[in-house]
Amino acid sequence: ALVAELAPDGQFNVVGVGQTTSKGLKKGVVVNIEATVQSIQKALEEAEVMADRQIVQVFTGIAGNHIVSFNSSGMVAIRDKEVSAGDVERVLETAKAINIPTDQQILHILVQEFIIDGQEDVREPIGMSGLRLEVKVHIVTGAVSAAQNIVKCVRRCGLEVNDLIL
């Protein structure tokens, strides 16, 4: 377990660390809920003592051979000929409108680039002029059950899960 605080410059400073033997997990996947909860609690307690604060919200790691990633893309017409936050949201929705197995869920959508009227490598499209907005993304999926089980273990420790991270 790591406890970090956000510094004014946008960097994270680690203020607490807790570690223990990882029991209840096999190859990154929960195989025993009670053992996993005990391992999380022990690491959490150590980290809280070092950081001198109680932790209530966490970003939880997820791993395992159930993690799959692939590329996707999307395209929309730009409303009002100037890219808005709504246009960006719409194009991302089209990129993730893909068929994935019912036992998988999207964990992350990583934007690789935006393209405006054929102009590639656009990083910040909002405010730019154009007629067509495209996006290339990398999508990471994981098993629904694996995600639910690790979240369940963390919640049993009295923590709120903000997000799952790789």
Give the label of every model feature segment.
Residues 2-166:
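Nucleotide/phosphate-binding catalytic cleft detector across ATP-hydrolyzing
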